[in-house]
Every structure is written in structure tokens, then in C-alpha cells.
């Protein structure tokens, strides 16, 4: 039996929003959060944890989610906010912004992981939620695609770092570029590999 057909402890009447983030680990750029309220009468096939989908499939689902969801919202916390608050608090901030920007107010919010942002709505953390709750899967896809597009756009301004390919993660290519060129305005100064270059 598929997980979504099993009665779940978080089944609640009314609108349900799924929330997830992308970009906690990279050395640069914002952390992006998305909140999605799906339309049960307009289902989307193939929703899954964004990390398990090909980039092409994520792109296709991104457009389908934007077209079919009752409402969705994407928000971010900047690299500057990450450095000021720390990555966990900045992630919670981005998630709260995403939920508060929804056009419709959900009855309950399900958040991927084991931490919850401070919300004025009933909420629950669901470990592995991006694989078992369709609304969280949809949110993970929106956040991931939005951030990947952001990196591709920023790459045009700073092509020497290779952001379009590694998306800001701590790859050998990125670390070599960081050592050669120093940090750009979007690098997270509080992250160790960036801080080392700035010493």
C-alpha cells in the first residue's frame, strides 16, 4: 500500500500546507523555503523528494505544481541573514515567510524534518516528510528548482566560481575558485571554508 493511501496521524480536515527548504548546505546564496497547499481535486502524479528526481523532472513538476496547486509561496533568507542569525534560524525564518505569504490560510502546516518555525498555525514536523507527504514533496521541488535557477542566474554575474554546476556546494571546483578569487558578495562568511579564505 502506498504511503499516501495510509491513514496518517496528521490527517486534518481543511487546508493542509506542506513546507520544505533547499540550500542549507551550500557555501553561498540564500536558503529557500516553499509552502504548498495542493488541490485534492487536481492531483499531480510523480511527486517525490526533489533529491530523488532528475533536474528535467523537477523542472516539469515545478511548472505543474505552480499551475495546479490551490496556492503556493516561495521565500528566502539571504546569505547576510544566514551569517547574522545562523543557518538553522535563517531556515526557520524563510519557512515562516513562505507560510505567511500563502494566499490561503491553511488549517495545519506540515514541515519536513524535526524542527518547526514559529507559526501562528497548528504545525507538525515530519521526519522524511518530503518522501511521504505530497504537499511537502511539492514544496521540496519548488524550493530546489527556484534555488537552482537563482544559482544559474547568479553564475552569469560571477562565472569564475562555477555556481551553475555545483549550486554553491563545497565541491573541489568551488573550493579551488574560492581560494583563487576570494569570496563574492553572496558567499556565507560564517561558513568555515569561506571564513578560512577571508583570514
Swiss-Prot record:
Catalytic activity line of the entry: Endonucleolytic cleavage to 5'-phosphomonoester
RNase H type-2 domain residues: 14-199
Annotated EC: 3.1.26.4
GO molecular function ontology, one term from the record: RNA-DNA hybrid ribonuclease activity
Primary localization: cytoplasm
Cofactor binding summary note: Manganese or magnesium. Binds 1 divalent metal ion per monomer in the absence of substrate. May bind a second metal ion after substrate binding.
Binding-site residues for a divalent metal cation, renumbered to this chain: 20-21, 112
GO CC aspect terms: cytoplasm; ribonuclease H2 complex
Essential cofactor(s): Mn(2+); Mg(2+)
InterPro entries: RNase_HII (IPR022898), RNase_HII/HIII (IPR001352), RNase_HII/HIII_dom (IPR024567), RNaseH-like_sf (IPR012337), RNaseH_sf (IPR036397)
Gene Ontology annotations of biological process type: DNA replication, removal of RNA primer; mismatch repair
UniProt-annotated location(s): Cytoplasm
Alphabetic keyword roster: Cytoplasm, Endonuclease, Hydrolase, Manganese, Metal-binding, Nuclease
Domain of life: Bacteria
PROSITE patterns noted in UniProt: RNASE_H_2 (PS51975)
Stated family: Belongs to the RNase HII family.
Family annotation (NCBIfam families): PRK00015.1-1, PRK00015.1-3, PRK00015.1-4
Function recorded in the entry: Endonuclease that specifically degrades the RNA of RNA-DNA hybrids.
Protein's name in the database: Ribonuclease HII
Species annotation: Polaromonas sp. (strain JS666 / ATCC BAA-500)
Gene this chain is encoded by: rnhB
Amino acid at each position: 500500500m502506498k504511503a499516501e493511501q495510509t491513514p496518517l496521524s496528521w490527517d486534518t480536515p481543511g487546508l493542509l500546507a506542506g513546507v520544505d527548504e533547499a540550500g542549507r548546505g551550500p557555501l553561498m546564496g540564500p536558503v529557500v523555503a516553499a509552502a504548498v497547499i495542493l488541490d485534492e481535486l487536481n492531483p499531480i502524479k510523480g511527486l517525490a523528494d526533489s533529491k530523488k528526481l532528475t533536474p528535467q523532472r523537477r523542472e516539469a513538476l515545478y511548472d505543474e505544481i505552480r499551475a495546479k496547486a490551490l496556492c503556493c509561496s516561495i521565500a528566502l533568507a539571504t546569505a547576510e541573514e544566514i551569517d547574522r542569525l545562523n543557518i538553522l534560524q535563517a531556515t526557520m525564518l524563510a519557512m515562516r515567510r513562505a507560510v505567511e505569504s500563502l494566499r490561503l490560510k491553511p488549517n495545519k502546516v506540515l514541515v519536513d524534518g524535526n524542527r518547526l518555525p514559529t507559526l501562528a498555525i497548528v504545525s507538525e514536523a515530519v521526519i522524511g516528510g518530503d518522501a511521504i507527504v505530497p504537499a511537502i514533496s511539492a514544496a521540496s521541488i519548488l524550493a530546489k528548482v527556484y534555488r537552482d535557477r537563482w544559482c544559474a542566474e547568479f553564475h552569469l554575474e560571477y562565472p569564475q566560481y562555477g555556481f551553475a554546476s555545483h549550486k554553491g556546494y563545497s565541491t573541489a571546483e568551488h573550493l579551488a575558485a574560492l581560494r583563487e578569487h576570494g569570496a563574492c558578495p553572496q558567499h556565507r562568511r560564517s561558513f568555515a571554508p569561506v571564513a578560512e579564505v577571508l583570514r
